[in-house]
Amino acid sequence: MARNVVYPLYRLGGPQLRVFRTNFFIQLVRPGVAQPEDTVQFRIPMEMTRVDLRNYLEGIYNVPVAAVRTRVQHGSNKRRDHRNVRIKKPDYKVAYVQLAHGQTFTFPDLFPEKDESPEGSAADDLYSMLEEERQQRQSSDPRRGGVPSWFGL
C-alpha cells in the first residue's frame, strides 16, 4: 500500500520521520441514479480492497464508515482504431461507502444554472430586431401585385 522506502531505524526517544502516503488515488463520483444521503460513490483502483478503502477514509480523512460495497465495472469495448481493431477501455472498481449513523453527504453543485441577467434582455432585444428585419425582407412587395419575386422584369 505504501511506497517502498527505506526508513532510518527508530531509536527510543528519537522522532518518527515517516509520513504515510498511499499509492492509491480515489475519485468521488456523482452517482448516475439517486442514492440514499448516507451513501457515497467512489471510483477506486482494481488493486484496492474494501478494507484498504475503509482504512483510507477513516485514517486520512477521519470519515466514519459503516459499510463498504464494491463492484467491478468492465470498460467498454466499442471503439475501433484505424485498422478496425477494437480498443478496450480499462476496467475499474466502483465502491459504495455507507457512512456511519447520522452522517450525510450531498454532492456539491459545481455548475449552477445562471440566472437571467440584464445582458440577456439586451440579447433578446437584438434577436427580436433581427427577426423583424428578416420578416420584412421575406414579405412580398405590395407593388408587384402578387407576382412572385423570381418572375423578374
From Swiss-Prot:
PANTHER family: LARGE RIBOSOMAL SUBUNIT PROTEIN UL23M, RIBOSOMAL PROTEIN L23-RELATED. The keyword Ribonucleoprotein applies. GO terms for cellular component: fibrillar center; mitochondrial inner membrane; mitochondrial large ribosomal subunit; mitochondrion. Keywords: Mitochondrion, Ribonucleoprotein, Ribosomal protein. GO terms for molecular function: RNA binding; structural constituent of ribosome. The gene is MRPL23. One of its GO terms (biological process) is translation. Component of the mitochondrial large ribosomal subunit (mt-LSU). Mature mammalian 55S mitochondrial ribosomes consist of a small (28S) and a large (39S) subunit. The 28S small subunit contains a 12S ribosomal RNA (12S mt-rRNA) and 30 different proteins. The 39S large subunit contains a 16S rRNA (16S mt-rRNA), a copy of mitochondrial valine transfer RNA (mt-tRNA(Val)), which plays an integral structural role, and 52 different proteins. Residues 131-144 have a biased composition (Basic and acidic residues). InterPro entries: Nucleotide-bd_a/b_plait_sf, Ribosomal_uL23-like, Ribosomal_uL23/eL15/eS24_sf. This is Large ribosomal subunit protein uL23m. Belongs to the universal ribosomal protein uL23 family. It is found in: Mitochondrion. Signal peptide: none annotated. Residues 108-153 are annotated as: Disordered. The keyword Ribosomal protein applies.
